[in-house]
Amino acid sequence: MTKYEILYIIRPNIDEEAKAALVERFDGILTDNGAANLESKDWEKRKLAYEINDFREGIYHIATFEAETTSEALSEFDRLAKINLDILRHMIVKVEA
């Protein structure tokens, strides 16, 4: 299994319950599609380097997990994160061992 890290930026004006539901939903997408050893946590609310969708800051969330390279977890997360309006940006990185 390969270790991956996902960083995504959540819009700053989301309420706490909606943010918790969003994080739970996307963590579920990863685990339901073959990811293991998921560790998910909020990083912090930070000022953005440039404006994204009229927002000047965002809530950074980071998730680390292990998955097979052929796993659907990465492609499904990427597909749904692009559609979701609460996620401003996301990045998936393969962690070197």
Curated annotation (Swiss-Prot):
The keyword Ribosomal protein applies. GO terms for biological process: translation. It comes from the Bacteria. Coiled coil: none annotated. NCBIfam families: S6. Gene3D superfamilies: 3.30.70.60. The lineage of its organism: Bacteria, Bacillati, Bacillota, Bacilli, Lactobacillales. The gene is rpsF. Belongs to the bacterial ribosomal protein bS6 family. One of its GO terms (molecular function) is small ribosomal subunit rRNA binding. Keywords: Ribonucleoprotein, Ribosomal protein, RNA-binding, rRNA-binding. This is Small ribosomal subunit protein bS6. Transmembrane segments: none annotated. It comes from Lactococcus lactis subsp. lactis (strain IL1403) (Streptococcus lactis).
